[in-house]
């Protein structure tokens, strides 16, 4: 598992990262309690995410990501398939729902 914490991202960078295999993108914010919990889970549970390359994006520093991924709720996690299309999207966070979602979309 590779985790990237992106400070600045554009639509082009996002597309490039996805093409390079960054297949799980988590959009959140530091002021969002559920986002902080998810970020901590990602950092402390690499085994759960071993099938994914993870990119965590702060939507306050990268507001265009909100439009690009049609984010309505934080955090939002998005898995891309091999064709760089959205395979699955999860809005919100509870640990068990996130783990179940990851396992379903390996």
Task: State where each predicted segment sits.
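Structural micro-motif
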Residues: 69-78
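Bacterial N-terminal signal peptides
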Residues: 6-15
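Solvent-exposed loop/turn segments at secondary-structure junctions
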Residues: 29-33, 60-64, 72, 85, ...
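A short beta-strand-turn-helix
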Residues: 15-22, 63, 67
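Non-catalytic, surface beta->alpha helical segment in thiol-disulfide oxidoreductase systems
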Residues: 81-106
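Extracytoplasmic/secreted envelope proteins and their assembly/folding machinery
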Residues: 39-42, 63-66, 95, 99-102
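Local sequence-structure signature of Cys/Sec-based thiol-disulfide redox active-site neighborhoods
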Residues: 20-50
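Thiol-based oxidoreductase modules, predominantly thioredoxin-like and allied folds used
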Residues: 26-27, 51-63
